[in-house]
Amino acid sequence: MSDTFSPDDVKFMQLALELAAKGQYTTAPNPSVGCVLVKNGEIVGKGFHFKAGQPHAERVALADAGEKAKGATAYVTLEPCSHYGRTPPCALGLIEAGVSRVVAAMADPNPQVAGKGLKMLADAGIPSAVNLLNEQAEALNKGFLKRMRTGKPYVQLKLAMSLDGRTAMASGESKWITGDVARADVQKMRAKATALLSTSATVLADDPSLNVRWNQFPDDLKAEYAEDTVRQPIRIILDSKNRVQPSHQLFHTHSPVWLVGSIPRDMSVFPDFCEQMLLPENYDFDLLMTELGKRQVNSIWVEAGANLAGSLIEQHAVDELIIYVAPKLLGDNARGLCQLPHLEKLADAPLWQLQECERIGDDLKLSYLPNLLIKE
């Protein structure tokens, strides 16, 4: 297995990553993958995985190339699969097409693959190289990769606040702290997530739909994705007291709703896309995330109030903290960002490290990782 890469290798893998990104709103629970086939320095085929059950990126690129695939180098953003699932193995497809070399951005930690795809290629006499633009490939599939490695989804906690760290007026009024551009960005982030997590308190207070509103997408994304192709996230509602009712706006949008609680209730009054997810009383977030991982939830976008935000942080259940900051001051009577009732000493305050800072219209979008996850 070779690991020496040329400038052309980097160029074509970058294109494969750009193709893979086109699937980020549609592929879950599968990863987003792109593939480029190159022969004599020219692209002869390319493709990306669009949706679970449809052809994988390698198969799309091979179909695009036809007979020109023979003798080509395949650049793929994730190790080709080697098992029969909803579709045949991609490693086998590359072998049958007669490609001369395969370059993978990274190995696939999926236990069904995990080096078996590269071995299948090697056994067929096809040289391969791995770990080209690995960090970019990892960033593209944070949810899938975490679930494969730990059995749990990648959790992004979204918060919106004023310059003085407030999320709403004392009365609860919060529409809208941030501007139109930031709220449109939230729609994109919702669409990338497998599931959206909130609480019955939020449902009762705001009666939100918690769906992806395609009409708020930027024009370039609308041109790229028809409304019916964008995946709606599973709406997961923590509802320990069974307070959510069929009349709530959640059920006016036909996408799955999972009500998480410990007390069985009559689900026959709810639409058929709603189910109750029963967990033991006083369950913790580790158990919840493990159960969601078993249900093939790759990533979770959290939108809730200060209670859930604080609880997730205290239980170290947040992989990424995303804060939208509006250029407003709400005063000391306004509501705070998160509740951390057990925090008494400054030395014990959770530490986060800024990863990205982006201007979104008149607002800022800040992305943080927990300090314990940061590589030295």
Task: Go through each PLM region and give its residues.
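Conserved histidine-centered catalytic loops in small-molecule metabolism enzymes
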Residues: 341-376
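Short beta-strand scaffold segments in enzyme catalytic cores
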Residues: 32-41, 159-160, 366
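Short gly/pro/ser/thr-enriched loop/turn and capping motifs at secondary-structure boundaries
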Residues: 109-112, 135-136, 204, 243-245, ...
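Flexible, gly/pro- and Lys/Arg-enriched active-site loops
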Residues: 314-352
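Zn2+-dependent cytidine deaminase-like catalytic core
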Residues: 37-136, 263, 313
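Short, basic/aromatic recognition patches
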Residues: 8-28, 147
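Active-site ligand-binding patch in enzyme domains
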Residues: 146, 157-163, 167-299, 307-310
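Residue-level signal for inorganic ion chemistry
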Residues: 16, 34, 81, 121, ...
